[in-house]
Amino acid sequence: MSQIEHHPQDDTLFSYAAGSLPAALALVVGCHLQVCSTCRSQVRSGESLGGELMTALAPKTLSDRARANVLQRLDMQQSQSDCEQVSVGSETIVSPAAPVKGVMPSLLQKILKEQDFDALPWKKTIAPGLKQIVIDCDEGQARLLRITAGQKMPVHSHRGSELTLILSGGYSDTLGQFNAGDVADLDGSTEHQPLADDDMDCICLAGMDAPLLFKGWLAKLIQPFVGM
């Protein structure tokens, strides 16, 4: 099992607990929670605090967006319940959904109707060494990316927020090395160029609330065809 080194920012986790993250970003956090007990604990703390605040407020009718967020969270929590660590005596049993290279989180399996990354209908893009699967989301963009081993992504920054969860393989950039289970929580202040590890393809789940900002004329030229 990989040791998780990179987690979502605290404000991202509390926004998730409050149900205020756009759907694409919430999907990434939900999949990360399935393999990270540290972040699950933080989200539970945020939910407890939110519950206490709600009881102190006068009841109000939920907006359509708030209701949709609540229903989505309930669905995610149901999937996460299968991923809890269960202590038995002095031993700790970790579910198979732990961050092992090549293992797809059960929440993503439910959406994609598949368990094997290699069996997915990957679509080639005009960008060299990059395949993707677009995931329908009501808010933001979510997609599964497959970067060929040893291949670089174009240099880019962000017009908004981006969350990327490594599912298999890994990549490195100016922020460090990212492996299975790690999350890159990025905003407009970050410019980077992920480089996939040499030993295997890097598969990751990316969610964003605004398109990326590519650097260089060639990257800008192909951006409309990639869709990010």
Region locations from a protein language model:
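Conserved short histidine dyad/triad with adjacent acidic residue
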Residues: 125, 131, 136-158, 187-191
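Short beta-strand His + acidic residue motifs that chelate non-heme Fe in jelly-roll/DSBH
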Residues: 43, 153-155, 174, 192-197
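Glycine- and acidic-residue-biased ligand/ion/polar-headgroup-sensing regions
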Residues: 148-151, 158-173
